[in-house]
């Protein structure tokens, strides 16, 4: 495995560990999720370029669309939670309440 792919997989693993370790704040979780999506985008782009598979060139763009949607929903949720509760602690949220 080339060193570039190893570094990208290491970045993905670091972001995944960040989600698992810093899960008390919503903002930290969102930043780690964005890091995971960025490393996945780079890995998919490099894999598509290395394979010379022309039909898969749209895959990184679709991944970016999903990342943008995830970021928009995450920021909307962060704004709603911080306006309602005044903090972004995930532990204090109960999503089962109406």
From Swiss-Prot:
Keywords from the UniProt entry: Electron transport, Membrane, Mitochondrion, Mitochondrion inner membrane, NAD, Respiratory chain, Translocase, Transmembrane, Transmembrane helix, Transport, Ubiquinone
Record's catalysed reaction(s): a ubiquinone + NADH + 5 H(+)(in) = a ubiquinol + NAD(+) + 4 H(+)(out)
Family affiliation: Belongs to the complex I subunit 4L family.
Any one GO CC term of the record: mitochondrial inner membrane
Residue ranges crossing the lipid bilayer per the database entry: 1-21, 26-46, 61-81
Function: Core subunit of the mitochondrial membrane respiratory chain NADH dehydrogenase (Complex I) which catalyzes electron transfer from NADH through the respiratory chain, using ubiquinone as an electron acceptor. Part of the enzyme membrane arm which is embedded in the lipid bilayer and involved in proton translocation.
Assembly mode: Core subunit of respiratory chain NADH dehydrogenase (Complex I) which is composed of 45 different subunits.
Subcellular location per the Swiss-Prot or TrEMBL entry: Mitochondrion inner membrane
Protein's name in the database: NADH-ubiquinone oxidoreductase chain 4L
Membrane topology: Multi-pass membrane protein
E.C. code: 7.1.1.2
Xref: PANTHER family: NADH-UBIQUINONE OXIDOREDUCTASE CHAIN 4L, NADH-UBIQUINONE OXIDOREDUCTASE SUBUNIT ND4L
One GO BP: ATP synthesis coupled electron transport
GO molecular function, one term: NADH dehydrogenase (ubiquinone) activity
Top-rank lineage group of the source organism: Eukaryota
């Amino acid at each position: 495995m080339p060193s570039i792919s190893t570094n990208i997989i290491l970045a993905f693993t670091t972001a995944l560990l960040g989600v698992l370790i810093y899960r008390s704040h919503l903002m930290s979780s969102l930043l780690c999720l964005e890091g995971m999506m960025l490393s996945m985008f780079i890995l998919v782009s490099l894999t598509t370029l290395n394979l010379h598979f022309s039909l898969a060139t749209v895959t990184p763009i679709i991944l970016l669309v999903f990342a943008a949607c995830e970021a928009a929903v995450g920021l909307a949720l962060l704004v709603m939670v911080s306006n309602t509760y005044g903090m972004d602690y995930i532990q204090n949220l109960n999503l089962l309440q109406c």
